[in-house]
A protein has these predicted regions:
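Short, mixed-charge low-complexity intrinsically disordered segments
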Residues: 39-77
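A broad, structure-centric signal for solvent-exposed, well-ordered loop/edge residues
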Residues: 8, 15, 30, 62, ...
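A short, structured loop/turn motif at beta-sheet edges
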Residues: 23-30, 57-61
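Short aromatic-glycine-(Arg/Gly/Cys) micro-motifs in beta-strand/loop hairpins
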Residues: 1-17
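A short, exposed loop/beta-hairpin motif centered on an aromatic-Gly-Thr core
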Residues: 15-25
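Secondary-structure boundary/capping motif
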Residues: 1-3, 36, 62
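A short, charged, amphipathic alpha-helix used as a generic interaction element across diverse proteins
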Residues: 25-45
Length: 77
């Protein structure tokens, strides 16, 4: 399984999650990240104001970015 890390980005600031996550594919990592963000936004709508989550591969290079508007219902955009 491939290794992925998550980076919460707010403008130029970046906070790296110290955990390493294992998924079969990058799409599986993105799907899990979208699900997690959707769950957190349902609990607290302002949880990701101005922030995004970067998914990085084992080398630390970002391979995908998930923004709140990617997972919000259309009526909240």
């Amino acid at each position: 399984m491939a290794q992925f890390t998550l980076i919460i980005r707010s403008g130029p600031e970046a906070t790296r999650d110290p955990n390493v996550y294992h998924f079969p594919t990058a799409q599986d990592a993105r799907d899990a990240t979208e699900h997690m963000m959707r769950t957190l936004l349902a609990e607290r709508a302002d949880a990701f104001d101005g922030k995004a989550i970067e998914i990085a591969d084992a080398t630390g290079h970002p391979i995908a970015v998930v923004h709140p508007y990617d997972v919000m219902p259309v009526r909240l955009h």
